[in-house]
Each structure stands twice: as structure tokens, then as C-alpha cells.
Amino acid sequence: TIAAFDADFIRAYYERNYHQENIVLSVAGNFEEEEMLGKLNEKLGGWKRETPFVQHDTHAAYQISCVEKEKDIEQVHVCLAFPGLTREHPQKYALAIFNTLFGGGMSSRLFQKIREENGLTYSIYSYTTAFADTGVFTICASMNPNQTERVFELIAEELKEVTAEAFPEQLIAVTKEQMISNFIIGTESTLNRMTAAGASLLLRGEVQETEEVIAKIEAVTAADVLATARAVLDTEKISYSAVGNLKGNDFGTLVEKFFK
């Protein structure tokens, strides 16, 4: 596809998408508003395009997928994926807290149980991806191919445990404090404030205030985290990808054995 792009294609794409109706300008720091608006109008006020802004109404739906790709390396890299939450889903902060506890760092359950206690993986973690109309929750691990079955077994055990019983409220509280602290520290950077404000306006239609984010994080309970984990970690909708040394492993069979 990319090889087929030529100068005319790129130029047409630019003309179609890059114009005033499609731009968000975000400014942060030491400036005078009227002076800044004057300068922006001077530089960009005459920038006209005939093509109107087009809001695409297509909806991206999660599709169960299984992908395997052999590569000439010693390790195997595996991702297990579940339908996640959209960017504006009311439980997105509950999922963020769950992800932090489950696989979001070196103190998470996945890292401690599978890498530290059992020494089975080179790396293991989870993360969330959110878009306007869909999302994905992903677990990633890299390991010696001989350890794959045991790693799948332990991941399955962890999934069962975290969807069977809520995390202690004290642990939830500590995680929320950590998330809020990281968020506040991030807002101390002028560059971060500028980027966050612009992205919020572009993607949400308004600038999300710091106090709003903090309040929504603080409002999450252990019951919210458990309910969200149960909703997201639907093993009937699990997808997987495996890349690397695939010899000796039937990944479809392993997924069926431990997650179905």
C-alpha cells in the first residue's frame, strides 16, 4: 500500500485534510491572549481550503483474531487481547487502576508472579488502548518457547483470581494516590499542559480540567474495579498473536486449554 503512494496522492491528502476547520491550536505558558490571537490570525487567518471538514461516522468493532508469524529468533513474543473500553467510557479510570495493579509495572501481579517468583519470562505486562469507538486490553509476554505453556497457565490463573474477588480497598486507595500524583506531576510541565489541552479539545470537544480527572479517579471503588475487570476479561472474546520461535507450541490449543 505505502509503495503505491506518490506525490499527487500525498498532495491531495494534504489539501483534503489540512485546513482551518481541522486544526486545534493549543498555547500554554507566559503569553498575552489578545497578542497571541493577533499573531495567529496574522499567520493563519488567510489559510483557506475549499474542502469542508468531514466527520466520519464509521464504527470500528472488535474482531476476534489469531495471528502467528515465525521469525528467526530464540524467543517467542505473545499478546493476548480482549475488547477494551472507549476513550470516554465512564469506567475507563477503573480499568486504568486495574491495569496498574494487574500488569502495569514491576509491582504488578503479572510481573511479580510470573517473572519474579517463577522466572519464566523476559518481560510481561499489560496495557490499555482506547479510541473514540472501541478499545483493547492487552497482555504481552516474551519468553523461551519451552516456557510458553506454563506462562499461559499462570496468566489464566491470575485472570481467574482477579475476576473472582475484589482487590483490597487499601490497595485501591494506594494505586489511586499513585495515579493522581503522576497526573499532577505531569501537569507541572508547560509542554504537557499544552499537549493535553490540545488533545482534549481535539478528541473530546472540550478541555478536561485537572480537578475533573482527579475527582473521577478518587470516585473509583474496589467494586468498580472488579466489575470492570469482569466485563473486559471475557475469555470467549480473547484474541492472540505470537511472533518469533513458534516451534513446539500450538497456540490455538493453548488458548483453548487455559482460557476457554
What are these regions (language model features)?
Residues 113:
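Catalytic cores of enzymes that engage adenine nucleotides and/or redox cofactors via long glycine-rich
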